[in-house]
């Protein structure tokens, strides 16, 4: 399970994620940068939640995020990231389709993408949404969203992210500390032990 939370404030995007990894009955945390749920993809940061094999299909292609001086836009993400990701997931027969559902196929993953100026969410049905102030993907994302909506701007961004992550961890065993923080100004990971 995973939870990634992002807050956009004063021209900086702050991201935070849990480090808990669950596989069956096994619970662990991995603190190597390659295994964190926030990845550097060129000049972008991407937060990931969902099916690990499909996340790896996205994070193994940083070239999809090369903007060549162009701003990060919804159109750019749809044309250069989502279309290639969809084709790859489809060609590898990893689309999740419910038999008795008219819903479109899903990837089983959601992503938060930022270049520091803009913040986007890529949903598991490949829809792209531009976010104005904050977003969250993953397990207990509704709990995190409720916390962010109710707590508003009363705290600095990293404190809000940590409170949302802690509240979610309290409510669900799939989310847990230590937590990792990063922002687009400093671009350095910080591990927060509990």
Please give the residue ranges for each predicted region.
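Conserved short S/T/G-enriched processing/targeting/catalytic segments and their helical context
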Residues: 1-99, 128-162, 175-178, 182-186
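Accessory, usually C-terminal, subdomains that scaffold auxiliary metal cofactors
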Residues: 164-167
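Conserved phosphate-donor
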Residues: 99-118, 171-186
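Patatin-like phospholipase
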Residues: 189-194
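Long, charge-patterned amphipathic alpha-helical coiled-coil/hairpin "stalk" segments used as oligomerization
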Residues: 104-138
């Amino acid at each position: 399970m995973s939870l990634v939370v992002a807050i956009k404030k004063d021209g900086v995007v702050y991201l935070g994620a849990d480090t808990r990894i669950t596989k069956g009955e096994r619970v662990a945390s991995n603190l190597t940068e390659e295994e964190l749920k926030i990845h550097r993809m060129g000049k972008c940061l991407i937060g990931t939640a969902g099916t690990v094999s499909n996340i790896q299909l996205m994070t193994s292609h940083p070239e999809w995020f090369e903007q060549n001086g162009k701003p990060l836009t919804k159109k750019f993400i749809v044309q250069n990231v989502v279309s290639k990701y969809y084709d790859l997931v489809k060609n590898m027969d990893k689309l999740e389709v419910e038999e008795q559902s008219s819903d479109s196929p899903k990837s089983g993953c959601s992503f938060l993408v930022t270049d520091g100026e803009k913040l986007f969410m890529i949903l598991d049905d490949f829809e792209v949404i531009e976010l104005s102030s904050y977003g969250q993907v993953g397990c207990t994302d509704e709990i995190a969203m409720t916390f962010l909506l109710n707590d508003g701007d009363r705290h600095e961004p990293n404190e809000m992210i940590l409170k949302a992550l802690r509240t979610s961890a309290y409510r669900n065993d799939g989310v847990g500390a230590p937590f990792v923080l990063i922002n687009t100004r400093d671009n350095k990971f910080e591990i927060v032990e509990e």
